[in-house]
Amino acid sequence: MNKRAQSRSAARLAAVQALYQHEMEATPVAQLIHEFHQHRIGAIIEDAEYADADVPFFDDIVKGVLARADEIDAAITARLASGWTMERLDRTMKAILRAGTYELIARGDVPVGAVVSEYVDVAKAFFDGREAGFANGLLDAIGKDVRKK
């Protein structure tokens, strides 16, 4: 993986963490982004080194998800199984799906397959294979919905 791809992968992981924090604590977006810029991205915390991330890409994902939350949640909800709601999803999975869906909707410069693959990898960092498969299927379906040619 080249340096640009690595920095984008790190940005995606950091964005999911930031979105999770926002969901848990309702941290204002400016404060949230500042905290990640100053204390998380590229830092070493408890002997874990956080990779350098593509900071503008991180900012775009976090701000974009929060600005377009209703549109993103509607796209996800449309692909959930009957009887499922956003509230039923684990908060980490919700952050993964929201970030991935934002990229599918707003970042036409990133291929669908790359978005799906990247967020499946993020899901694997937090969950076992079943949840990663869930993220894969849902993001792939959303990609087909929003990137119709």
From Swiss-Prot:
This is Transcription antitermination protein NusB. GO terms for molecular function: RNA binding. SUPFAM superfamilies: NusB-like (SSF48013). Involved in transcription antitermination. Required for transcription of ribosomal RNA (rRNA) genes. Binds specifically to the boxA antiterminator sequence of the ribosomal RNA (rrn) operons. It comes from Sphingopyxis alaskensis (strain DSM 13593 / LMG 18877 / RB2256). PANTHER family: ANTITERMINATION NUSB DOMAIN-CONTAINING PROTEIN, N UTILIZATION SUBSTANCE PROTEIN B-RELATED. Signal peptide: none annotated. One of its GO terms (cellular component) is cytosol. The keyword Transcription applies. It holds the Pfam family NusB.
